[in-house]
């Protein structure tokens, strides 16, 4: 049986890593998220998130982060193995349901990063 965990090594944690991804990655936009994808030298995908104070208070920001992490945790085997993915939440995401987050981020799994422009 496959483990559906999100290990510490599968997260992007260092500021230096975020800056490198922002500088060299390909940006894609959906209605509620901006996605930056960059190649890495590892054998597994890594997730990073940015949720600013424009989203709302800490409760709302943490809720969005939990939803994004859950989507990634359940779908990480469908991402390319050597990718760093940073998901930036836009200001109107705080009231989204998990199904809406899955539907919108599911676009990542079916299209190339430069082609994702769903508004």
Swiss-Prot record:
It catalyses: Endonucleolytic cleavage of RNA, removing 5'-extranucleotides from tRNA precursor. One of its GO terms (molecular function) is 3'-tRNA processing endoribonuclease activity. Signal peptide: none annotated. Keywords: Endonuclease, Hydrolase, Nuclease, RNA-binding, tRNA processing. It is an enzyme of class 3 (hydrolase). Pfam families: Ribonuclease_P (PF00825). Its EC number is 3.1.26.5. One of its GO terms (biological process) is tRNA 5'-leader removal. One of its GO terms (cellular component) is ribonuclease P complex. RNaseP catalyzes the removal of the 5'-leader sequence from pre-tRNA to produce the mature 5'-terminus. It can also cleave other RNA substrates such as 4.5S RNA. The protein component plays an auxiliary but essential role in vivo by binding to the 5'-leader sequence and broadening the substrate specificity of the ribozyme. Belongs to the RnpA family. Consists of a catalytic RNA component (M1 or rnpB) and a protein subunit. This is Ribonuclease P protein component.
């Amino acid at each position: 049986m496959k483990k559906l965990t999100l290990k510490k090594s599968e997260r992007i944690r260092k500021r230096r890593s975020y800056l490198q991804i922002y500088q060299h990655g390909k940006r894609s936009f959906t209605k509620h998220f901006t996605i930056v994808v960059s190649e890495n030298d590892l054998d597994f995908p890594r997730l990073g998130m940015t949720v600013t104070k424009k989203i709302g208070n800490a409760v709302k920001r943490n809720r969005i982060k939990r939803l994004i992490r859950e989507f990634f945790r359940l779908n990480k085997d469908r991402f390319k193995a050597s990718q760093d993915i940073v998901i930036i939440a836009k200001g109107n995401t705080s009231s989204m349901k998990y199904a809406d987050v899955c539907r919108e981020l599911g676009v990542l799994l079916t299209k190339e990063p430069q082609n994702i422009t769903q508004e």
